[in-house]
Amino acid sequence: MSAEAYLWFKSLHIIGVIVWFAGLFYLVRLFIYHEESKNMDNVLKIAFNKQYTLMEKRLANIITTPGMILALSMAICMVIMQPSWLSEKWLQIKISFVLGLVIYHSYCYKIMYSLQNGTSTISAKKLRLINELPTLLLFIIVLLVIFKNNFPTSVATWSVVGLIIFMLASIQLYAKIRKKNENSLSNE
């Protein structure tokens, strides 16, 4: 195959990755809103449940999953063109993180079905934590692709640790501010 074909595969792979991640980021955000709508009065709860269910299904089935399929199929095409890359340590590590992302994607479907059926036991706070996982995976995967076998372990390790701490602190701070605002509104 030609170098041009490889560039097409690579371009479509990048587009698929962007679509996939955009879908995952928004999907879990919808789950958070869906979960929070359970606290509304019955009429609103029913209306929001129907709307969030529809939005989640469309996002998952029309955007997120096709993005994943495009990203993975183009990655397979690139590896078929360059099979020697499979011996590269950075690619082996990247593949393991991508498999983690596929598992995360599948877990999102489980959450989606449980929200639709009214059997979800995951709090909005836990969903906010879950929502940060693809950010971490994206961070690691991009660093692996850019640096390849020269991956800056010490810098990357501390960056990931710092990012995790920052995200956890941000989630906690957001929850406190939100709760404080809700309490002040209910006291008025």
How should these model regions be labeled?
Residues 1-188:
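Polytopic transmembrane helical bundles with strong interfacial aromatic enrichment
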